[in-house]
Amino acid sequence: MTQLSVVILAAGKGTRMYSDLPKVLHPIAGKPMVKHVIDTAKQLSAKQIHLIYGHGGDLLQQRLSAEPVNWVLQAEQLGTGHAMQQAAPFFADDENILMLYGDAPLITATTLEKLIAAKPENGIALLTVVLDNPTGYGRIIRENGSVVAIVEQKDANPEQLKIQEINTGVMVASGASFKKWLSQLDNNNAQGEYYITDVIAMANRDGYKVEAVQATNLMEVEGANNRLQLAALERYYQKIQAEKLLLAGVTIIDPARFDLRGTVTHGKDVVIDVNVILEGSIQLGNNVKIGAGSVLKNVVLGDNVEIKPYSVLEDSVIGESADVGPFARLRPGTELAAKAHVGNFVEIKKSTIGEGSKVGHLTYIGDSEIGANVNIGAGTITCNYDGANKFKTIIGDNVFVGSDTQLVAPVTVASGATIGAGSTITKDVAADELVITRVPQRHIQGWQRPTKK
């Protein structure tokens, strides 16, 4: 089987984005456009991925430092052919070279596999699409059904401008063929650029067969040159993700108001309300309910978990039949055991909450271990930070913590203890003790409220 290498063109500035960020780093579903293309290339088992970079190269390399790509500098942006010329020294004669674009993130491996399979042994295959309005695109010129050339919009004559089949820019040929044709490119055109599309005419001249494969989905080959186009790609991507989940049995109340910015696995009878955002790696058990406006990132939810509206969870694990929210925030390192309850306006960070325990409202729990069947009263704060270091609070099983309590870490409250409301706990509490630290109540008779003078 012939090996495959992929070239991704990613040197453009993206002037119409009006941004300091290189165009290909603008995100679709929370991931840079070019990263989508790299991931697709990986699905094709490419031997090597050559990434052509230019504008914003330092930032591009920084953001993609973990990617297994060969960085190829295009110091001057003199056209697509010029970009390919920079990568040509790395091409092996006997491998196939697939050319992709870093700002066209929705191309699928399935479509590219069809294109690669259609490539003649001695020839080139290119991906085309038919548009109702082809303005701005290179036109496919055919003679007797065969592709003989591609003419760019600015170089096309009036008759050629009527053609609706356009070039997507995606093509595949052997390394030897590309090297031969790239060495013969010139910039004798209206733009003064080196067009990769000129290799089609060269292939015909040399007697090579040119095979065209029509993409069936326009959005798959669409690029994003401005933020309006970027938003259109985002909406299409999210539509596809929602449809996949719906067909797999997930209820999404309004697919147009759902965003998936990562991957999700799920059980049966999951219900997702409107304006929910799922990021990173999400695992949902059976009968999970996620309320409106909630944001989940890298979260595991067990069976029968309910996330009530407008809750934010990150890097957290929620046990079966637990519930969270509304308006709760679970920060990284939070683990809730089965049947735990976290109510409104509660923030938890790097803490475990035991089975059946309740943190009802208006509470901060940080760097803590809380046992089973504990009740944390409203307004409780674990004071875990002294301005320099973090300290731990440990609460045993069956503890009752009254409202408006401050637990000054490091501190341990043993099982069965009761903390009276309004207490500030600075020392360890033994099992089954009652601790009250508030000032005794005083009654002042005959007191007069002050009046305005």
UniProtKB/Swiss-Prot annotation:
Cofactor(s) the protein requires to work: Mg(2+)
Sequence positions that bind Mg(2+): 103, 225
GO biological process, one term: cell morphogenesis
Residues engaged in binding acetyl-CoA: 378, 384-385, 403, 421, 438
Domain of life the protein comes from: Bacteria
Catalytic residues identified in the record: 361
EC class (word): transferase
Keywords in alphabetical order: Acyltransferase, Cell shape, Cell wall biogenesis/degradation, Cytoplasm, Magnesium, Metal-binding, Multifunctional enzyme, Nucleotidyltransferase, Peptidoglycan synthesis, Repeat, Transferase
One MF annotation (Gene Ontology) recorded for this entry: UDP-N-acetylglucosamine diphosphorylase activity
Pathway: Nucleotide-sugar biosynthesis; UDP-N-acetyl-alpha-D-glucosamine biosynthesis; N-acetyl-alpha-D-glucosamine 1-phosphate from alpha-D-glucosamine 6-phosphate (route II): step 2/2; Nucleotide-sugar biosynthesis; UDP-N-acetyl-alpha-D-glucosamine biosynthesis; UDP-N-acetyl-alpha-D-glucosamine from N-acetyl-alpha-D-glucosamine 1-phosphate: step 1/1; Bacterial outer membrane biogenesis; LPS lipid A biosynthesis
Pyrophosphorylase: region residues: 1-227
InterPro entries (alphabetical): Bifunctional_GlmU (IPR005882), GlmU-like (IPR050065), GlmU_C_LbH (IPR038009), Hexapep (IPR001451), Hexapep_transf_CS (IPR018357), MobA-like_NTP_Trfase (IPR025877), Nucleotide-diphossugar_trans (IPR029044), Trimer_LpxA-like_sf (IPR011004)
HAMAP family in the record: GlmU
Subunit structure: Homotrimer.
Name the record gives this protein: Bifunctional protein GlmU
Organism: Glaesserella parasuis serovar 5 (strain SH0165)
Gene from which the chain derives: glmU
